[in-house]
Amino acid sequence: MIGMSGPHPHHCHHHHERDDHESGQMPYGQIDPATDPAGGLGRRTMLAAAGGMLMLAAVPGTARAATAMTAGAASAGAPAVAAPGASRASRISQGTTLVHADLHNHTVMSDGDGSADDAFASMREAGLDVAALTDHATMFAISGLSQSEWRTTGELANAADDPGQFTAIRGFEWSHPLQGHINVWNTSDFADLLRAGSPGSLYRWLVGRPGGLASFNHPGREIGRFDNFSYDASARPQLVGLEMFNRTDDYLFEGWSSRTASPLVACLNAGWRPGLTGVTDEHGTTWGFHEGKGRSGLWVAENTRAAVYEAMAARRCFATRVSGLRLDATANGVRMGGVIGLTSGDVRFQVDLDRGAVWDGKPLRVQVLRPGTSVPTVVDVVDTVSGSVADFTVPLDVADGDWVVLRVSDPELANPTPGPNGHPCNDFGVAYSSPWWLQP
């Protein structure tokens, strides 16, 4: 176990010189705290600052790649960087292909600025393969979805959907001001607060719609934390997501400064079994074009709605906040999101990490996260580089808890929202695998 004195990483067999980042410009659309004139990196400060850097890192695939830059970035002389990204084929698994997805976006049909007519085309142009519109379902149609807007969202998704090339999905965001927000996809109707006034009532509504899938959004932002992640076993198969990256924020230590538990720990310890996701939660008019905001990778049999929903239900996904990243991981040959048949013993992890030539040889770390009481316990830290497969073994025991997650980090940068002093995850989060569960 790694204590608060800091990690002692063991090394994979890759050694490259570290890149020097340009002064004042971090590689994730963030702001370098050393040169930030505001002198701080609060969540809202980061959000406002990130808006000036809308660099698209184009990814390969069927969607047309483009490069966008705001007037603010252009006037500052900031370059528009196109990052081709990694191949969509895993080096360690067969039978699936990587697609890049953003499953949480807003329009003027709730509290967004942009017309829903433009959203899917923008996301496809930006290089996404899978996209969803998820406007708020609140208490009143004036601030959230109406029945006619729900129908319109479905019509727009059907018009934009291009099986094999681009998957367009209709969803909604159940939005409780105190308990939190939950995205729902693949249902024929939607539930607002008049129909489902609590997380528990929403779970019952969801279970009545067997194809529906849902996600805990920006977990811990609202004080009630989904009734403190109160567990409903009947809804567990359909609660397929926990947002670890929302906008530019890493939610691992959300609430730590006010001494509340990590949402990851609270959710998984409660018994839920979500995959881990990243989303832009876009409220502007440039859907898909924000480098540095969350996004998800899904491993699909094909790029269709049915295959996307299958991958979500299997938790065969990862969270990141960089475009073009490929992350695949296995534990004793089991892909992320799966069950490892083990009581105790050594578990061999293989981690395929790549972002193409733009990150070739870039130093990264893989942290092995296990249950803790308020923050995850880090039982190993492995140095690796982009473009390689990390291969390492860690002893695990179900007596210490039934889940394990891999966090990929950039050791050169600090986590703007850190946890306890000396915690190994106080570096900059790049990606999270979905969990595995130990099940004897």
Question: Could you describe each region identified by the protein language model?
Answer:
Residues L41-L47:
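N-terminal export leaders
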